[in-house]
């Protein structure tokens, strides 16, 4: 009789343990917060900053892209020509600026001084001739027209003398500060144009801004492109973000840094891990894409969860179940 009693007691104890375990599991599930979200779709529309003819594309839709990878190239010839022209412009402006700083050579000053002497001699002759003509005019030996011609020759010689003297003075004192400043500004303008030409040539190569997967290839080689027109669309694969929404009643559980578990239909028994990286400071009406029926008419707060152990199986747009359990909090 003792053996059946022992068996009965063992069965009762096992049932109690199972009942207690079931109650504990259900209480843990009931205390945890479950939300529904989607892996965020993050894309970059890539384009050339300059326009031109598309020479080549090195990638196709579905290709894995790495940051810094060359994706496409425009025809460089027009921009290489512009760069050569800009370099020549800098050389001309630099030579003019150096000339302004250096002033005039001794040979130029000597030539200017000789020109002053020659102009002075011409003026002295014209002045003496005019004075003689004045004496003859008084005795009515010459006509008024002859006197006027002599005066005109004297005035012309005087003007030429002053011009030669001014030129000599300029040569001796050097260029004016205003002229030097103007030459410097012209040089800086040419240098800026050169820098822009170098940048334009550099921008004929399209570089991937980050890792990802190529979604679309909008054009083909040979196409004429405007600056800024979309050439390729890149899907950013890292980091992986999940977008979800929480109502005000449960907002206190969704604090930045909180660790959570993320389940997908393809991995119902092996969750991903993540942390809340952002909680929207303002409420909004629930978007139509939210799958929880009781939240669709509520004001909710948007969450961004950063997946810390993402792999290639976690695709953009994929629905995800988020569990805010005590295990996730302390894991």
From Swiss-Prot:
Ranges in a coiled coil: 142-207
Keywords recorded for this protein, A-Z: Coiled coil, Periplasm, Signal
Subcellular location(s) per record: Periplasm
Pfam family, one: HlyD_D23
Entry superkingdom: Bacteria
Residue pairs linked by disulfide bridges in the UniProt entry: none
First and last residue of the signal peptide: 1-15
Keyword Disulfide bond: no
Listed GO CC annotations: periplasmic space
HAMAP family on file: UPF0194
Similarity-based family: Belongs to the UPF0194 family.
Name the UniProt record assigns to this protein: UPF0194 membrane protein CKO_02332
Taxonomic lineage from the root: Bacteria, Pseudomonadati, Pseudomonadota, Gammaproteobacteria, Enterobacterales
